[in-house]
UniProtKB/Swiss-Prot annotation:
Organism: Rattus norvegicus (Rat)
Basic and acidic residues bias spans: 123-148
Keywords: Acetylation, Differentiation, Isopeptide bond, Metal-binding, Nucleus, Phosphoprotein, Repeat, RNA-binding, Spermatogenesis, Ubl conjugation, Zinc, Zinc-finger
Keyword match Mitochondrion: no
Residues recorded as bearing Phosphoserine in the entry: 85, 240, 309, 327, 343, 390, 409, 498, 515, 527, 620
Name of the protein: Zinc finger CCCH domain-containing protein 14
Gene behind the chain: Zc3h14
Length: 736
């Protein structure tokens, strides 16, 4: 049981280190969740689907790495040679350390390849586990050199015990695979390096017993041809130090990165490797200071040794100088945390199946998200009030669309020649608006506006209301021939005829054009229909219906304007010199005013339209009051009623400022019900006391005298009924 717990703890620490490297580690919940999936033997595709929410673009990279580790664990447990090995080399793929040492051994020179990921399991006998980092470089020959233990220049890595495992614990050794992209994660690779061979990185836990590293078969390691290939190595280690590994080459030595800056190391190396050593001295000093500033305890570190050579002497340098001094790579620090122990006894702990089920259901609910459609881009167009009639809306939209026309100066063909996407979009909107309105060609010609008129829009008050119009797709195109002179005059006439229907935005007053223009005010024109009540709107439009109803279906000007207005408009269009007189323009504005109806406004004196109301508002007092027979319909002023809205008199001759409620009509006289056909009406009713009277007795109304229905067929007594308390029987008290 302790072996499985230790293996699970090692896998979890490796997963946590990988998540920290990818920047996806937040708390302990994600590693726990991944361990649950490992325990459930989820496939790589299932893990990729479940972890995509947390890891994003790094999901595939993480799952490939995790399944590679699990595959190595399975191969180790099934391989008898790994079980017989006295000790293992433990490597960590993504949890670097600060303490490192370089061991030396036998190796051959092969084609360069990234070291494979190997996992081995054994039981170390000593409680004093040590961490060592070995980095090898391959040379051109297979000459073996013995390492002198007594030499003063010998570099031996000192390792401190990081933990003391139990004697029966399993130890996991993890080495980087090609999928780990360790070259991308280690940032200390110099760009101008001339050497194409990459060093191998090995992290090992050592003990007093020899350890065997387990590698993948050679067939699976020959994928890339520009990297190194490693052979299984036999490492023997002393109780306090590691046995040095021999490297091929002449006088080649690998120095521990953590001791490169010590004085005795510098004294022995600087004479031989001074041109290369001094280049990287500053970088190593900076890295040494960075490691000293670490606040959290460090588990392990990855060290990369880089070779340097000149352009013309690459082969000679490899043989003569051997391994060059490298610099420290970047490292990831992980605090060593004790294993979490449950605070509750096993009998009181929650069922693991329920926890796994809840986690799976939560994951399913998170992944099943709703895909909302993209919000379409919208466009706002200023328009007049929303309560216009359909003909008025058509007229306003035509003018608004033509006002935007000068900004879209080139037509469709010219836009395509220029290739301007913005102008194409605006031209498409204009054509779609015109095609949606379905305007006659003659009307379109008369409604064309010029740039000069577009600059004159500031003389009309602005309207802040607008409606939302979705951007339409390109539909049928309508090519409009510009006619600036007629468009200017048409717009002026339309502003006069429908000034109360069309409101545009304020613009800066531009330079005055040379052509004559008419400044028309809106004095005396009724308010827009949006400010009226429903009754007033019906009253106003009774006198404003167009005469020619058949032409109104064309949605043009003829269906909206009266014959007199059309006549004046045509005269203005035919006048080329602009000599349309102001007198005729005044006649035109007067002609559009509806005549007052000889009917008193029922909202007076609280009518909101004031003088613009088409109904009569009394001014002079009534001379026949109070004997006026017209009452509230009188065209003259009557005094105010003191009861106002509370007045219940239907024919009250006084004026009521507030709107009164429905007046109850007087209840008609109740007619006695007719006798039924099968019996005569009882002559003694309602005083008849005979219980078995064969004559007709009408039923009493349940509401009695409180009944308000004038056509009620039930009997209503004419005498008053005693109150309820008088009809209550009380038992008389008997004297004792």
């Amino acid at each position: 049981m302790e072996i499985g717990t230790e293996i699970s703890r090692k896998i979890r620490s490796a997963i946590k280190g990988k998540l920290q490297e990818l920047g996806a580690y937040v708390d302990e919940e994600l590693p726990d969740y991944i361990m649950v999936m490992v325990a459930n033997k989820k496939s790589q595709d299932q893990m990729t689907e479940d972890l995509s929410l947390f890891l994003g673009n790094n999901t595939i990279r993480f799952t490939v790495w995790l399944h590679g580790v699990l595959d190595k664990l399975r191969s180790v447990t099934t391989e008898p040679s790994s079980l017989k090995s006295p000790d293992t080399s433990i490597f960590d793929s993504n949890v670097p350390s600060n303490k490192s040492s370089f061991s030396r051994g036998d190796e051959r020179r092969h084609e360069a390849a990234i070291p494979p990921l190997a996992v081995s399991s054994s039981r170390p006998e000593k409680r004093d586990s040590r961490v060592s980092t070995s980095s090898q470089e391959h040379k051109s020959t297979n000459v073996r050199h013995s390492y002198d233990d007594g030499a003063s220049t010998r570099l031996m890595s000192t390792v401190k015990p990081l933990r003391e495992p139990a004697p029966s614990e399993d130890v996991i050794d993890i080495k980087p695979e090609p999928d780990d992209l360790i070259d991308e994660d280690l940032n200390f690779v110099q760009e101008n390096s001339l050497s194409q061979k990459k060093p191998t990185v090995t992290l090992t836990y050592g003990s007093s017993r020899p350890s065997i590293e387990i590698y993948r078969p050679p067939a699976s390691r020959n994928a890339d041809t520009g990297t190194h290939l490693n052979r299984p190595q036999l490492q023997q280690q002393q109780s306090s130090t590691h046995t040095a590994k021999q490297l091929d080459g002449q006088s080649s030595q690998v120095y521990e990165a953590g001791r490169l800056c010590e004085p005795e190391v510098l004294g022995s190396v600087e004479d031989t490797y001074s041109p290369f050593f001094r280049n990287n001295l500053d970088k190593m000093n900076i890295e040494e200071e960075n490691f000293r500033k670490r606040k959290l305890p460090v588990v392990s570190s990855v060290v990369k040794v880089k070779r340097f050579s000149h352009d013309g002497e690459e082969e000679e340098e490899d043989e003569d100088y051997g391994t060059r001094v490298g610099s420290l790579s970047s490292s990831v620090s992980v605090p060593a945390k004790p294993e979490r122990r449950p605070s509750l006894p096993p009998s009181k702990q929650a069922n693991k199946n329920l926890i796994l089920k809840a986690i799976s259901e939560a994951q399913e609910s998170v992944t099943k998200t709703t895909n909302y459609p993209a919000v379409p881009q919208k466009q706002t167009l200023p328009v007049a009030p929303r309560t216009r009639t359909s003909q008025e809306e058509v007229l306003a939209e035509m003018v608004q669309g033509q006002n935007r026309a000068p900004r879209i100066s080139p037509p469709v063909k010219e836009e395509e020649a220029k290739g301007d996407n913005a102008e194409k979009i605006e031209g498409t909107q204009q054509r779609q608006l015109l095609s949606r309105l379905q305007i006659d060609p003659v009307t379109v010609d008369t409604m064309e506006l010029s740039q000069d008129y577009y600059d004159m829009e500031s003389m009309v008050h602005a309207d802040t209301r607008s409606f939302i119009l979705k951007k339409p797709k390109l539909s049928e195109e309508i090519v409009v021939t510009p006619n600036q002179d007629s468009g200017m005059k048409t717009a002026d006439a339309l502003r006069v005829l429908s000034g109360h229907l069309m409101q545009t935005r304020d613009l800066v007053q531009p330079d005055k054009p040379a052509s004559p223009k008419f400044i028309v005010t809106l004095d005396g024109v009724p308010s827009p229909p949006g400010y009226m009540s429903d009754q007033e709107e019906e009253m106003c439009f009774e006198g404003m219906k167009p005469v020619n109803q058949t032409s109104a279906s064309n949605k043009g000007l003829r269906g909206l304007l009266h014959p007199q207005q059309l006549h004046l408009l045509s005269r203005q269009l035919e006048d080329p010199d602009g000599s349309f007189s102001n007198a005729e323009m005044t006649d035109l504005s007067v002609a559009q005013k509806p005549e007052k109806l000889l009917e008193r406004c029922k909202y007076w004196p609280a009518c909101k339209n004031g003088d613009e109301c088409v109904y009569h508002h009394p001014i002079s007092p009534c001379k026949a009051f109070p004997n006026c027979k017209f009452a509230e319909k009188c065209l003259f002023v009557h005094p105010n009623c003191k009861y106002d809205a509370k007045c219940t008199k239907a024919d009250c001759p006084f004026t009521h400022m507030s709107r009164r409620g429905p007046v109850l009509t007087p209840k008609p006289a109740v007619s006695s019900p007719a006798p039924s056909s099968n019996g005569q009406f009882c002559r003694y009713f309602p005083a008849c006391k005979k219980m078995e009277c064969p004559f007709y007795h009408p039923k009493h109304c349940r509401f009695n005298t409180q009944c308000t229905r004038p056509d009620c067929t039930f009997y209503h007594p004419t005498i008053t009924v005693p109150p309820r308390h008088a009809l209550k029987w009380i038992r008389p008290q008997t004297s004792e």
